[in-house]
Amino acid sequence: MIAPLSHRWRVWFALLLTLVLLGSAARAEDGYRLWLRYDPIADSALRQAYARSLTEIVMNEPPSRFGAATLAATRDELVRGLHGLLGTDVPVVAKATRDGALLVGTPENPDLLPLVSERDLRAASEEGYILRHVVVDGHPRVLLMANHNIGLLYGAFALLRELQLNHPIDHLDMVSAPRIQRRLLNHWDDLNRFVERGYAGRSLWEWFQLPDYVDPRYRDYGRANASLGINGTVLNNVNADPLILTSDYLRKVAAIANALRPYGMRVYLSVRFSAPVEVGDLTTADPFDPAVQRWWSAKADEIYRLIPDFGGFLVKANSEGQPGPQNYGRTHADGANMMADALVPHGGVVIWRAFVYDDKNHEDRAKQAYDEFKPLDGKFHSNVIIQVKNGPIDFMPREPFHPLFGAMPRTPLSLELQITQEYLGGSIHLAHLGPMWKEVLDSDTHADGPGSTVGRIVDGSLEHHGISMIAGVANIGTDRNWCGHPLDAANWYAFGRLAWDYTLGTDTIADEWTRMTFSNDPRVVRTITKMLLESREAVVNYEMPLGLHHIMASDHHYGPGPWVNDMKRADWNPTYYHRADAEGLGFDRTATGSNALAQYAPPVAKAWGDLATCPDTLLLWFHHVPWTYRMRSGRTMWDELCLHYQHGVDTVREWQKSWDALHGSIDDERWSHVKVLLARQEREARQWRDACTQYFQTFSKLPLPVGVEPPEHPLAYYEAIKLHYVPGSAEAK
């Protein structure tokens, strides 16, 4: 009896050790999987219910109708996801044999066509999908149907998301399609792999190894984007190197395009307007010159031979030193249309950025893009999209919506958002930007009466455009977790979800990401979701409250610098924007100042132009406000300003306590990383508070209000802080 017992204990010990090791491996998290964590569902009863509802994957699509690679990606995702979430293999079969079969296909499948209506198929459109619980001949099934292969892939991710979120699927009934056609990431990546305003390592694109070696991470990148419905990527910096258009580099671009194509992603390139001179041996880039026109046409032909589904060109022209058509006495429309003509035969588009301002123009910088582009409305060709930042300055923590939205009804406008945190603490500070983007998308321009939201302009529905686009400047790099801060991938996720459907609530998006990235533990979900949803406003409070803007340190844009007044351009100086003096604070953009308000529709201009009706959040953007002005709270503007700075600091401290309480509820690797980052964020929030309140106090001459902590150091201490090699800055190249 002793020997068998000993053997049995050895077996049990080995099994126990294996389980412990597996458990430890499962708990080790480096963030690489992002929100696509297909670990077994913790609720065993729910997991078993899902397993009964999803017993096999039925796929028998005619191969002629579909790109084989995308169909294979759909199958592989379902197999991988269901195996991981359910803890069992779910076979792929050609014909349903069990209850709970998952039926996957298109209208070409005669067995599936009767299960949906024409109305559903129209609603699904080109890229959407139908997910539905159905009964076929008395047998319960789950239907995943789409008009095209990419819709099947998007639908597969949507189904797996429902399981990750622990949603019931026994009454599943979902028809979903994107509201915006082109949903792009913009990478500000240089060919030397430096990422301008990047905080998560170097560029993903291994140009020196391409086209021979294609990093498997490109496919993981495509897969993550497909899970959100992002369908395009601009690979390189808007401050473009003309080498990207040489034949050698185009072959490298083609290799990346091949890796991303199965996931529905089209590749775009940022191009330099003067490329015909720099890599084309021409003496001019004048868009009216026939030789220049022929060069761009020939270059487009070359690109499309290599990349048949190439998306088009993104152009930054006549801005911040970049060349453009104005160098030759031409307009933005002249330059964009010349390039657009080269792309028309291939179905490509030109995306022309409206981020323009001129140091020789002494007009308010906030007005300059409107002044340049508004007169050109209706003069761009039909395959030109004007890409407009969310606000009129430059991705500040809070800006009013850009006045061009609603001002160019005959021109498609794309909304450009910044996912990377150039002005919100890089990848050090927690700043979830879903609420910021939702704020601008829901903003009512009143351009065509009430309800003329920025979202309806961007999706083309308000002005009846046949093309629509939204873009996000990526926060992605070679860091193992992709985005630097363990919670920053929530911004990538939020951008993708809002690009697909900007009517989604930010609380829903934050809840989804938290559950998929961490767990469905209610305490974990409540804590992290609350932190995410508070974070943008907290950063606004301790950096630039009440409509203050552009008061950060020079060049690297990290930390406070309201005192800076020595930049070579006036409109690069924080003092240009805050205009603090003995009387008050803020930029007067009313009729008595720069009159930038006149660029907005009358109802908006009227509301924002009156101190009594202007939102507190935009007060100092549009008004020079006396220090002793009484705010809605009853406090003076000075007291309100200082208390906002303090509140931002207090909020970060609350997060620290909340995060500490999660110890043991999430993996140690990510918990420890975030704990360290929150400590630094709290310290730097105090620096912002102390630097800004002391600096503005030199003008107000007023004491800090009760409730605001005294500064730790004198103002000179903060003015003397010099940071070097901040990631994403020119010095760090």
Where are these regions (language model features)?
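Bacterial N-terminal signal peptides that target proteins for export
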Residues: I2-F13
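Bacterial N-terminal signal peptides
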Residues: W12-L22
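Acidic, contiguous N-terminal accessory segments
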Residues: A26-D137
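Feature activates predominantly on carbohydrate-active enzymes
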Residues: P62-E77, G81-H83, S117-L314, V344, ...
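Surface-exposed patches in mature extracellular/periplasmic domains of secreted proteins
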Residues: G87-K95, P168-D173, V238, R523-T527
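Catalytic-core regions of glycoside hydrolase
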Residues: V90, L112, Q209-P211, S247, ...
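Acidic helix-start/capping segments at beta-turn-to-alpha-helix junctions
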Residues: V92-P110, H171-L172, A177, K530-E534, ...
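Catalytic domains of carbohydrate-active enzymes that cleave complex glycans
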Residues: P450-K733
